[in-house]
A protein has these predicted regions:
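Thiol-based oxidoreductase modules, predominantly thioredoxin-like and allied folds used
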Residues: 29-39
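Local sequence-structure signature of Cys/Sec-based thiol-disulfide redox active-site neighborhoods
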Residues: 1-25, 29
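Small/polar loops that bind or transfer phosphate-bearing groups
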Residues: 7, 33, 61
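Non-catalytic, surface beta->alpha helical segment in thiol-disulfide oxidoreductase systems
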Residues: 57-73
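Thiol/disulfide oxidoreductase modules built on the thioredoxin-like
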Residues: 43-48
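A short, hydrophobic beta-strand/beta-hairpin element that forms part of a small beta-sheet core
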Residues: 50-58
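Alpha-helix C-terminal capping segments
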Residues: 21-27, 52, 69-73
Length: 73
């Protein structure tokens, strides 16, 4: 299975639907990263979250559906 990472932060209104889409495809087999705990991540991702990486490559930004993620995987 591919390594899926979701970058998110508290108060992000687009993050919950993105996490739900990833969970629908991956179950609990993905990494959820709260960027608010790391200054560098905050700087890199704050204006782009949620960001979903698949095997280290940024594949989605802002929105995705479970079907779109399935197509990538």
């Amino acid at each position: 299975m591919a390594r899926v990472v979701v970058y998110t932060a508290p108060g992000c209104h687009l993050c919950a639907p993105a996490v739900e889409a990833v969970r629908a495809v991956c179950g609990d087999a993905f990494v959820l990263v709260d960027i608010s705990t790391d200054r560098e991540l905050e700087r890199a991702y704050r204006r782009r979250i949620p960001v979903v990486e698949v095997d280290g490559i940024e594949r989605f930004r802002y929105e995705l559906t479970a079907d779109e993620l399935r197509d990538i995987l």
